[in-house]
Amino acid sequence: MRESLTYETGLHEECGVFGMFDLEGGDVARDMYYGLSALQHRGQESCGIAVCDTNGPKGVVNCYKGLGLVNEVFHEETLKRLGGNLGVGHVRYSTTGSSTIENTQPLVLKYFKGTLCLAHNGNLVNAFEMRRQLEETGAIFQTTMDSEVIAFHIARERLAAPTAEEAIKRTAAKTRGAYALIISSPRKLIGVRDPFGLRPLCLGKKGNVWIMASESCAITSVGGEFIRDIEPGEIVTITRDGVFSDKSLQQEKRAHCVFEYIYFARLDSHIDDVSVYEARLRGGAALAHSFPADADLVAGVPDSDLTAAMGYAKASGIPYEIIFHKNSYVGRTFIKPTQEERENSVRIKLNILEPAVRGKRIVLVDDSIVRGTTMKNLIRMLKKAGAKEVHVRVSSPPFLFPCYFGTDVPSNKQLIASSHSVEEICREIGADSLGYMPVEDLEEMAGGLPLCTACFTGNYPMDVPDGEIKDALE
């Protein structure tokens, strides 16, 4: 007997990293605050800022971290105490490790060669093996994060390596998985991107201040100018002597995370020379060509896929309408601990504009269906408000496999599409029809980039372990 398709929502963001180096010695904490706020969509569990003064005593770091949103953790007095011209920041949603204060970032490590501050976005597939190797030689860990494993290996390699960059390269040679790192040593700001380019990282500048960030929107939000993406397999080092690039980690094969363009990245960002806004418009248009519908209006589910809905409407010639009022002060549905509370949260967060839907045939566009709870409730609400038909269109293919690279996609048994047909899902959520984005349309949607589509196809760009790798570090 099949289990019920009434699942909780389950697609979560990853993390965001941000770094600044003011070459003229000005404090960066305030701009760090705004930069992290611009990346808040990438993680809402915790955040932190670590700063140091490159003109002061070497190795002295001021760090403040906490659980919650950026504007909940940091206040005016907190920022005033964070004096320094070199900073690393982080916003977190946990993909490995529990949601505790110990697991907040940036990590600050004091070791034989100095001090290392590290912020990490991504997930390692061999973190458990790397951690065990360190523990067998006496290492003691303070967190359950794979990020600490990276930091420890860099610190250990630095004992013999002539520079921090060389220690990073030696660590990368042992590492499998996704990572975008921003690291500060006492006189350097260093950005590192994994050879596949799974996680984004970019470079910008504001006057004499160099900036690194997960997304370009964080650079422009602090008044900076986006310069370029840090390339897959590239290490960029910023010092008072200039900007230096090392591409010795690069490889031919690349696999950019497709979900940056479907969901994760902010609409005003450019990632690897591709506009996120334009990518979502193309995705909606492709969906309209593959799965047309006889309907009176097209609408998106706030805020996840309004742009794809606009693309669908433009390509189909069906008018785009707003049919939901969103209460912006209600937390995201996955935060609630019980199924009943999750369902109630959907009703409170989104209310139907009845005059817009009464008697109408609706194309409803969303970015994903992972477990199905939210969509089932929305369709029920729409039909109760008088909608005649609801045709669901999803701007991603069905989720069939877990992600090992930093996206919190549940295990196979929780993914409804892995054990139920499209027709079964359609019946269970109460839709009049259901269409998913074809896998073959994804690359064109993302501007022709080589993509990681493993969560849809099971074709991982590297060897991955059996089971949930995140369980090994929780």
List the model feature ranges, each with a label.
Residues 351-365, 369-370, 394, 464-465, ...:
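Mobile, glycine- and charge-enriched loop segments
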Residues 317-362, 373, 400-406, 410:
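Short, glycine/charge-rich flexible loops or terminal/linker lids adjacent to PRPP-binding catalytic cores
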